């Protein structure tokens, strides 16, 4: 403690230095101190786990680790430019700070929250001192003036609100894009604030933006409520894919629920019973809904694995259309007072149909417009009839958002932790893991009789196994399970000319019904040098663009090939092995038989089925007491709590009711459909390849043969096509490489 009337030495030194600097101060902003400049080789005060999130760090530390780190790098560059111009950004809240906060407004990570908080505090501290740039400097320049929002539809009369409404910003997906574009009020990953009276978790499972002047995403008829984004952002060990498509929703079943069942005369194996509903649902459970062919190429040629982490969903630019007929002329007009209803089944109360390889997903080509599929489901049946345990669901029993033209709907979801998909092939075989130069110290039974002159005598002999008898060596691991399939050739002359598509197929029996084992457990498609063969029901078969539904030729389908897993998995069309079937003795020789099915044994190791650009991303694991290695047999990630179903329907509007009362159910409605855009953003975690292999890898490429056509493009009629399936296993790893 300093004596009365005296200042402490440290405070005196600080004040003296400040007075000296003030005495020499020149007009204009103070010059930056040398220590304030970014140095390319400096670490600075960077948050652990980041490269740029923190002050005084260098600008050349490699790729940012995530979106917050990328925003920090852009912020550092902006500071560097200000320092070069003689401005000192550290002593005022400036446009770079505002843009940094804008980029992080969707980021809920620790680093993102901390970055926003620091610069919000900086702004609050400097505001009373007049050291905050004017808003005109803070906002990015616009390519055109932002018009005032036109009138919005009123809830009762259909007329607009009186007077000019404040201009609204547009959707910001959190991507680093055109600095001149108009920012959006409703980020894809940021649900709007909950209306008063609702809990804070009300919007966590999906929300509709209300018609209001509070920048919650609701826009009038004249303004779009979101922007189109189709791209991918690569950030070190992450990639964010964003897809936007245009959808159309008809009115299904004339707003009715209906029973559906198998037709009379159907075989017992084909009987079913269920319900169709007037609702549709959004299905984006295919990889090509999110990855372009080029992005898929980048993904599989540079990574050993990937898995989904987060998902953001948004419906926007919703338009309800009314169709009228007058003297043979069809008129389509906006209906500003009609609504659509949307909700997410976050509790999985409804039968879950996503992941069953249905049509109706977002199309792979962004320019194509798709129809929202109708929601229907099956329940327990006896033949074509219901039983006591059969369930029926009324979807109007669920709370839903009612949205009009100009509204939007958002939903955010976090994937459960799942293993990385193994996007690599093995460069070793499970039965060839040994050193061929060294014999084993273990022995094996090499002979059971001993030659003696011209006869043989019973006698046991043992040997150590080496390279010359590698088949006899002791091994730690067994190949995976087997459920044998019939072999089919792509060359018709190699096949029997009888009809065996059902009678010769591998099937399982459940509740008195047979079903194909299709595709069944992951097994290799064929042996070496037998590419023309494939298992009858053991592979995924995709249709080419324009293929008919039934009995199409082989040239119109795409047959996948799981040949890369034959290093660990049995070949589907071969026996698993052989097994002893008797007890040998003096007068009885040892006998064996083929093993065509083999369940799981201790010591088994195997690979799951590969995933394909055209294939599913996930499947819901059934809710049962027991399950074993629930990896979906069609490929993808097995999830106990997958992205919930998002359901939508056009709200019925009665058409010209009678002026006299009738107790009958109303069955006449105006003809309506709805349309708009849907955007889905998914963040994927990547497992970068870091092989020490010397010789070049096999990688996916489009120049696999000489062609005069461009793959994955449109034809002269504007029809987009995918000419072949693309899996993920081109890079290699050895079998015993440690997991990352």
Predicted regions and their residues:
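Extended terminal accessory/targeting regions
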Residues: 2-154, 170, 177-178
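Capsid-like jelly-roll
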Residues: 139-740
């Amino acid at each position: 403690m300093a004596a009365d009337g005296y200042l402490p030495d440290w405070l005196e030194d600080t004040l003296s230095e400040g007075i000296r600097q003030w005495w020499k101060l020149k007009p204009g902003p103070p010059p930056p101190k040398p220590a304030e400049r970014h140095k390319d080789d400096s670490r600075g005060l960077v948050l652990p786990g980041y490269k740029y999130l923190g002050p005084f760090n260098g600008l050349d530390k490699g790729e940012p680790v995530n979106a917050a780190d990328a925003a920090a790098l852009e912020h550092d560059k902006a500071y560097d430019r200000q320092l070069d111009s003689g401005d000192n950004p550290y002593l005022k809240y400036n446009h770079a700070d505002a843009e940094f906060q804008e980029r992080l407004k969707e980021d809920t990570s620790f680093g993102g929250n901390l970055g926003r908080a620091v610069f919000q505090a900086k702004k609050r501290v400097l505001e009373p001192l007049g050291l905050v740039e004017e808003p005109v400097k803070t906002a990015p320049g616009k390519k055109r003036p932002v018009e005032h929002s036109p009138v919005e539809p009123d809830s009762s009369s259909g007329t607009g609100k009186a007077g000019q409404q404040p201009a609204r910003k547009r959707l910001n997906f959190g991507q680093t894009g055109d600095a001149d574009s108009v920012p959006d009020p409703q980020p894809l990953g940021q649900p709007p604030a909950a209306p008063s009276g609702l809990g804070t978790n009300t919007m966590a499972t999906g929300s509709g933006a209300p018609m209001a002047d509070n920048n919650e995403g609701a826009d009038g008829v004249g303004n779009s409520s979101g922007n189109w984004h189709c791209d991918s952002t690569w950030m070190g060990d992450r990639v964010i894919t964003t897809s936007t498509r245009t959808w159309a929703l008809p009115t299904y079943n004339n707003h009715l629920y209906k029973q559906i069942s198998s037709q009379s005369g159907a075989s017992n194996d084909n009987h079913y019973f269920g319900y169709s509903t007037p609702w549709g649902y959004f299905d984006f459970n295919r990889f090509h809904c999110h990855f372009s062919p080029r992005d898929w190429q980048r993904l599989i040629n540079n990574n050993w694995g990937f898995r989904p982490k987060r998902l953001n969903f948004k419906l926007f630019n919703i338009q309800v259309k009314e169709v009228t007929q007058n003297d043979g002329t069809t008129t389509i007009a906006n209906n500003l007072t009609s609504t659509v209803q949307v909700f997410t089944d976050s509790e999985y109360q409804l039968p879950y149909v996503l992941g069953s390889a249905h049509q109706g997903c977002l199309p792979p080509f962004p320019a194509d417009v798709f129809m929202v599929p109708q929601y229907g489901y099956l329940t327990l049946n006896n033949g074509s009839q219901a039983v006591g345990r059969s369930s029926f669901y009324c979807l109007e029993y669920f709370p839903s958002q009612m949205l009009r033209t100009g509204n939007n709907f958002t939903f955010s979801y976090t994937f459960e932790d799942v293993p990385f998909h193994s996007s690599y092939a093995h460069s070793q075989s499970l039965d060839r893991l040994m050193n061929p130069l060294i014999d084993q110290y273990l022995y094996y039974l090499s002979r059971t009789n001993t030659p003696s002159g011209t006869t043989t005598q019973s006698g046991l002999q043992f040997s150590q196994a080496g390279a010359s008898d590698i088949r006899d060596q002791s091994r730690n691991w067994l190949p995976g399970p087997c459920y044998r399939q019939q072999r089919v050739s792509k060359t018709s002359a190699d096949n029997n000319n009888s009809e065996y598509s059902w009678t010769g197929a591998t099937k399982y029996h459940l509740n008195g019904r047979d079903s194909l084992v299709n595709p069944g457990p992951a097994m290799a498609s064929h042996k070496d040098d037998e590419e023309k063969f494939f298992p009858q029901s053991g592979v995924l078969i995709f249709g080419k663009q324009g293929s008919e539904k039934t009995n199409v030729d082989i040239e119109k389908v795409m047959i996948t090939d799981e040949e890369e897993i034959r290093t660990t998995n049995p070949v589907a069309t071969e026996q698993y092995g052989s097994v002893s079937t008797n007890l040998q003795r003096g007068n009885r020789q040892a006998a064996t038989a083929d093993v065509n099915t083999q369940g799981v044994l201790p010591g088994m190791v195997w690979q799951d089925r590969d995933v394909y650009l055209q294939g599913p991303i996930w499947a819901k694991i059934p809710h049962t007491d027991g399950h074993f290695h629930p990896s979906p047999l069609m490929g993808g990630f097995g999830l106990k709590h997958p992205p919930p179903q998002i359901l939508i329907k056009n709200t019925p509007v009665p058409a010209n009711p009678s002026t006299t009362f009738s107790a009958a159910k109303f069955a006449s409605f105006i003809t309506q459909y709805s349309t708009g855009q849907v955007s889905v953003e998914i963040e994927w975690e990547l497992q970068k390849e870091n092989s020490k292999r010397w010789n070049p890898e096999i990688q996916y490429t489009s120049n696999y043969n000489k062609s005069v056509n461009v793959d994955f493009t449109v034809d002269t009629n504007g029809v987009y096509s995918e000419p072949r399936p693309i899996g993920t296993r081109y890079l290699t790893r050895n079998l015993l490489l440690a997991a990352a």
